[in-house]
Amino acid sequence: MALENPKMHNSEISKRLGAEWKQLSEAEKRPFIDEAKRHRAMHMKEYPDYKYRP
């Protein structure tokens, strides 16, 4: 989306992508959710003492 609309602000891109995400079925979302879980587990294994500190 950003490549197709190089002058579009990031906030607008985020809004549009969020709207698209809400339109997806659970089955369409599943691969992304599973991949996020896999990355989370990998990160926890590699950095067991990591604590998010903004």
Swiss-Prot record:
Superkingdom assignment: Eukaryota
Single GO MF annotation: DNA binding
Gene3D superfamilies: High mobility group box domain
PROSITE patterns recorded: HMG_BOX_2
DNA-binding residues: 1-54
InterPro entries: HMG_box_dom, HMG_box_dom_sf, SRY-related_HMG-box_TF-like
Keyword DNA-binding: yes
Gene Ontology CC: one annotated term: nucleus
Pfam families to which the protein is assigned, alphabetical: HMG_box
Location of this chain's protein in the cell: Nucleus
Keyword entries, A-Z: DNA-binding, Nucleus
Full protein name: SRY-related protein CH1
Organism: Gallus gallus
